[in-house]
Amino acid sequence: MGLLALRQESKVHSPGPRRRARAVAARTFELSAFLVRVRKVVDVGARFKGRVTWHDACHGLRELGVRDEPRTLIMNVRETEFVELENADACCGFGGTFSVKYPEISAAILDQKIEAIETCGVDAVVSGDASCLMQIGGRLSRIGSKVRVMHLAELLAQT
């Protein structure tokens, strides 16, 4: 919703809806950006025993400029070792309808992401984007991987 309000405002031609879109966009944040930038919270008291990596979702990174905030939060989770994923900012291959229109290309992109995740020897891969989590989690499950897939909110809720 926030991304839509932020990026699609120019397509709203009436002043009333445009004002409402701006008002919504001003109060809508990606979770880690809200915690770190707005609330100045870097430690929520979470605990997760294991090695964790972060996948940068294309929209979060490129559209919203969210990169360091989730890493900061993860690094403050007790008993967690953060491992930077090789090419963490590379697409997972989902891209909305991209994976349907170009399934072979999508699968090849995902193969590279999965190889990077498996190579870094983590217990969990975390992201802030549900479609990335479904794409990555689906493949990890199909290959029988023990790597857990988690949304950032799920990791931060661990105690």
Place the predicted regions along the sequence by residue.
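Iron-sulfur cluster-binding electron-transfer modules in prokaryotic oxidoreductases
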Residues: 1-159
